[in-house]
UniProtKB/Swiss-Prot annotation:
Signal peptide: none
GO (cellular component) term, any one: cytosol
Protein's recorded name: GMP synthase [glutamine-hydrolyzing]
Purpose of the protein: Catalyzes the synthesis of GMP from XMP.
Glutamine amidotransferase type-1 domain sequence ranges: 9-202
Pathway connected to this protein: Purine metabolism; GMP biosynthesis; GMP from XMP (L-Gln route): step 1/1
Species in which this protein is naturally found: Rhizobium etli (strain ATCC 51251 / DSM 11541 / JCM 21823 / NBRC 15573 / CFN 42)
Catalytic activity: XMP + L-glutamine + ATP + H2O = GMP + L-glutamate + AMP + diphosphate + 2 H(+)
Gene: guaA
Binding residues for ATP: S230, G231, G232, V233, D234, S235, S236
Active site: C86 (nucleophile), H176, E178
Pfam family, one: GMP_synt_C
Length: 520
């Protein structure tokens, strides 16, 4: 997160909504830089960023409860345009003298908005007398407006669904314009940013690249940087950006834990050495990792072993180089946004995340994180800007622990080889069918289950392979991909015929939630 003022930016105050990041994505899509700050530190964030407009997010809290969160008064004293969404609308009204009460008719899901009056946010989009679909999710509702506000649109259960004080440039909506279920929502946010706040929208990956390179050079000076290269998009883009800034002062280390997809480590090493002239060390630590993982079935234990061994191996290799002053990481913006809690309790850990963990503290290095202001889609755009091929940028996400968490139960080299071959065939069939780019993530899972089969004249007793494919926008929610049955038949037949050790293939039709994308 940037530590200084950012010209032509938007500040998003987060009250704990599950979709606050979508607001930021819509602002970025409009070509404008923005930052999310939790309400507890919003005043500090406002002073630091010096934005040109403010958006107040939704929240699971109720504005009528004692101690419920509020926007800092400095926002309303600043004279800047403010857009309140759902809870953001309610707290804005309460803080400016209006009234809110718990609704007797809660409104969740699709609703229709009737436009009563024209307003600046509707320019080129909506007109008086028109009706539009929106997405509601609220219990409380505004019952009396502050001075200066007027109602510009209503719904059947929300008489103050869209309000405006055009003199002060304050706008509030009871629905969620940031979600895709509000078809014109992104355009409404764009109108607020461009038409009301007067922000041009010239923030681009080219401009970000130039700024990031300058900041890396200033931070690193003539010191050395090491970077853990996994072969994923995030670490690869971070490495290329750091290399552009400091050249041979960067050394990348690829720790091959033996849990990658077929030929993946070799292909990554070849690409970076041949096309980008990076100083890259390829460390084959597969015996070390698989030796400790063999027989381990608990997924959390697997992740912790992999994380510990990664740190130990990386640390050993870095010391052989004589150490470094900086550690480069592909940390993204969603990783650094502070979570908002109303209870003070910790969030539930669904899965431990595998990354470089405690390396900076252990090795007394400072972090270089050139992607920490970007979302995943922006990292891909930056990768294209840096010259990475689309075939690499568009690869499906791959977990840090690799095939270890796609092999439930105990791990052996034999199982990993069986899984690696099945996965390669599955992905090959997806590419042949022209489906790869339509799917967010696809992979094979080797189940710790054996079943009876018949091949030729003999009886078999071999493993079951599960195929998984999902569609998603950001990985937060996902639906299983609806394949044609002929495709599944082709993929299953090839896997059974070509992979020794598998005699049955099944397809996973679980969405997220209730399931997760990965099996472990």
């Amino acid at each position: 997160m940037t530590q200084t003022a950012h010209p032509d930016s938007v500040l998003i105050v987060d009250f704990g909504s599950q979709v606050t990041q979508l607001i930021a994505r819509r602002v970025r899509e409009a070509g404008v830089y923005c930052e999310i700050v939790p309400f507890q530190s919003a005043e500090e964030g406002f002073k630091r960023l010096q934005p040109k407009a403010v958006i107040l997010s939704g929240s699971p809290a109720s504005t009528v409860d004692e101690g419920s969160p509020r926007a800092p008064q400095i926002i309303f004293d600043s004279g800047l345009p403010v857009f309140g969404i759902c809870y953001g609308q309610q707290t804005m009204c309460m803080q400016l003298g209006g009234k809110v009460e718990s609704g007797h008719h809660r409104e969740f899901g699709r609703a229709f908005l009737d436009v009563d009056k024209d307003c600046e946010l509707f320019e080129g989009l909506w007109s008086s007398g028109s009706r539009h679909q929106v997405w509601m999710s609220h219990g409380d509702r505004v019952t009396a407006l502050p001075d200066g506000f007027k109602v510009v649109a209503t719904s059947s259960n929300a008489p103050f669904a869209f309000i405006a004080d055009e003199k002060r440039k304050y706008y509030g909506v009871q629905f969620h314009p940031e979600v895709v279920h509000t078809p014109d929502g992104a355009k409404l946010i764009g109108n607020f940013i461009h038409n009301v706040a007067g922000i041009k929208g010239d923030w681009s990956m080219s401009a970000y690249r130039q700024k990031a390179v300058e900041e890396i050079r200033k931070q690193v000076g003539d010191k050395r940087v090491i970077c853990a290269l996994s072969g994923g998009v995030d670490s690869s883009v971070a490495a290329l950006l750091i290399h552009e800034a400091v050249g041979d002062q960067l050394t990348c280390i690829l720790v091959d834990h033996g849990l990658m997809r077929k030929d993946e480590a070799a292909n990554v090493v070849a690409m970076f050495r041949e096309h980008y002239n990076l100083h890259l060390l390829h460390v084959d630590a597969s015996d070390r990792f698989i030796g400790e993982l063999e027989g381990v079935s608990d997924p959390e234990t697997k992740r912790k072993i992999i994380g510990r061994l990664f740190i130990e191996t990386f640390e050993e290799e870095a010391k052989k180089l004589g150490g470094a002053d900086f550690l480069g990481q592909g940390t993204l913006y969603p990783d650094v946004i502070e979570s908002v809690s109303f209870t003070g309790g910790p969030s539930v850990t669904i899965k431990s995340h595998h990354n470089v963990g405690g390396l900076p503290e252990r090795m007394k290095m400072q972090l270089v994180e050139p992607l920490r202001e970007l979302f995943k889609d922006e990292v891909r755009a930056l990768g294209r800007e840096l010259g990475l091929p689309d075939s690499f940028i568009g690869r499906h996400p791959f977990p840090g622990p690799g095939l270890a968490i796609r092999c439930p139960g105990g791990i052996t080299r034999e199982k990993l080889e069986i899984l690696r071959e099945a996965d390669a065939i599955y992905l090959d069939e997806i590419r042949k069918a022209g489906l790869y780019d339509a799917i967010w993530q696809a992979f094979a899972v080797l189940l710790p289950v054996q079943t009876v089969g018949v091949m030729g004249d003999g009886r078999t007793y071999e493993f079951v392979c599960a195929l998984r494919a999902v569609t998603s926008v950001d990985g937060m929610t996902a639906d299983f991909y609806h394949y044609d049955m002929e495709f599944l038949g082709r993929a299953a037949t090839r896997i059974i015929n070509e992979v020794r050790g598998i005699n049955r293939v099944v397809y996973d039709v679980t969405s997220k939630p209730p399931g997760t994308i990965e099996w472990e």
